[in-house]
Design a protein with these regions (language model features):
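Pepsin/retropepsin-fold aspartyl endopeptidases
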Residues: 1-74, 79-172
Length: 172
């Protein structure tokens, strides 16, 4: 009887670990702790202000899907990044011409120094919020795991509020 209970416990643990593992593996089988962040929700506040509400992903980061010059791009909010930063592939999808890009702007990151090219997004839409003429940095794909929504983008909102598991961006 004890052997059966032990086998049941091991089987249950294996199923739980398999489920948790599936939550952190992307469609190509690579480890990806940011696989399934909750989608942004959009609310209207008591004074008519529009709010974008982001729920923290499993790793504590905030993600959203934006439209950069009409192209869908997934961003991670990064208050340690001075600028909205696009990977080269995301910049190309957004229609940014990189033929004459000069990667001469140094940035210090957690992974060391990286050089970026400056560019401008004509528009970035997050739900019904529109940011126009946004300065961005473009970084080679192999130097950045995904596009970042930095402080210059956050500062375009009238108000922002952060708790441990929610980020609210407000437009009046």
């Amino acid at each position: 009887m004890r052997d059966r209970a032990g086998l049941y416990a091991v089987g249950t643990l294996a199923v739980v670990l398999l489920f948790l593992g599936m939550q952190t593996v992307d469609d190509q089988g690579r480890f990806n702790p940011t696989r399934a962040p909750l989608p942004a929700s959009f609310e209207t506040g008591p004074g008519g202000e529009r709010r974008i509400v982001l729920e923290a992903g499993p790793n504590g980061h905030f993600f959203f899907e934006g439209a950069a010059n009409g192209a869908p791009i997934r961003f991670m909010v990064d208050t340690g990044a001075s600028f909205v930063t696009l990977t080269e592939s995301d910049a190309r999808r957004a229609g940014i011409n990189l033929a004459r890009a000069d990667y001469n702007v140094p940035f210090e990151t957690a992974n060391g120094r990286v050089y970026a090219a400056g560019a401008t997004l004509d528009e970035l839409r997050i739900g019904d919020a529109l940011i126009e003429n946004l300065a961005v940095a473009v970084v080679p794909d192999d130097r950045l795991g995904g596009s970042l929504f930095g402080v210059n983008g956050l500062n375009r909102f009238d108000r922002r509020e952060t708790t441990r598991d929610r980020l609210i961006l407000e437009v009046e």
